[in-house]
Amino acid sequence: MVYRPTAHEFDDLPKIEFIDSCPYQVFLEQYLKPCVPVLIGPKLTAQWKANTTWITSKGDPNILHSYILPDKPCTSRDNTSGNSLLNDNDIKNFIRSYAERIVNNEDKNVFLDSLLLSPNYEYLEENYGTIPVPLAYCNEKDRYGSQRRETVPLKSALHELRDEQVQLQCRQAPSNQALKSLYAKDMHLFRHLDPADFPYSTPDIFADDWLNAYVIDCESDDFRFAYLGSHLTTTGLHTDVYASHSFSVNLCGVKCWLFIDPKDLQTIASLYDDQQLPSWITKDDLFRGPLVNHRHLIKILFQYPGQTVFVPSGWYHQVLNIGTTLSINHNWCNASCILQMYTALKEQYEVSAESLKDLLEDGIVTKDRFSQVVTEVVEANYGWCWRRFWGMIKHQLKRRDAILHSSEYFSKWPIQPEFLPPLSWEYSILKNILLNDEPGSTFDSGSPPSSIVTIFKSLGDFKE
């Protein structure tokens, strides 16, 4: 079925498909391979421990519940939400329309109860309070024009976020303009956790993850995050790191997403005076401004508690939090987006080399040193480099080889064979980057290292 929220003038924006449950083969063929976003129902993560420990209905009620009660005014005045995408009437219409379309009374009551859920501040502080986290002030800008951030212990962030939630609930602030609009983003709460203490398990449909398998096994790092934002906080229009995929599981609060298909990026950028994508798409953009005749290219999605969003590689998206929201997110990758990641990294090297070419032409550095400088700049600005990219590929090929031969290969990111795509398909993708160029002697160039090519060719005997 298709998820179709209605909120008057937003009705003509295309919607992201909703599916109640998603078997692996369905996900692989209909969404992962073609890189199509999808919203998945609560069954996918119903068994998560975080559903009972990270959130609660006994604490301060979430402000978004006021949008559903006819005898209760909304917290913010109409058109003062400060986010410039949805005013309070828009939000009210979306949420009430969704509730009205739930036929089963029991299901409707479950949904209404979910709007009361809030973060379990005491539990989060007790278990993760000393971990340093990035805290964004969404109403403030740094010198580069981005949201101002600082790193604080999670305990401090929780205290400030809870204060904001209480102020909104008590009607002490008419909008987020009077508050700090705090959003704790990219929180690494799981990096050093013992597996027995994990509050969730990665859904099987997302388990074929080369990125986390590599950085967890080889770098003691991860791309697993938690996000905690107050009412009307935002993440601007962007695409995910390294051209990876992501998924986001919403535990409490509501998220409004806008999506742009990669094939429509140039068209949309051309509609703006500077020929660039905006940092935030506004309601005026959609209905009176540059997008008024092209808003059919913008897809909208409301994500409610318990639901999971799959964001494919290359899809630009922005997010507005409604109520206090708490989510668990991964960046991840596999064969379905490895060509996009390869191309994106190659472009980073080309752009950096072009900007630094005077160093080479003026004889300031040697050719070998120039390559090192380019790599240093790419890694500093982009956070990724050929050495790590090829290391990830090699790690994945070794894991695949071990599965094929039923041999021992220890990994902190194990995967069951039934949640892997056909090797023949994976092989057909990888050969585009592993067999088209002459192998290199090191891991530091865009040419595939010969040691990786050797492993890859050996898998060719099994690909059928």
Swiss-Prot record:
GO terms for cellular component: chromatin; cytoplasm; cytosol; nucleus. Coiled coil: none annotated. InterPro entries: JmjC_dom, JMJD6_ArgDemeth/LysHydrox. Disulfide bonds: none annotated. Pfam families: JmjC. Transmembrane segments: none annotated. One of its GO terms (biological process) is positive regulation of translational termination. The gene is jmj1. This is JmjC domain-containing protein 1. GO terms for molecular function: 2-oxoglutarate-dependent dioxygenase activity; peptidyl-lysine 4-dioxygenase activity; sequence-specific DNA binding. Residues 182-349 form the JmjC domain.
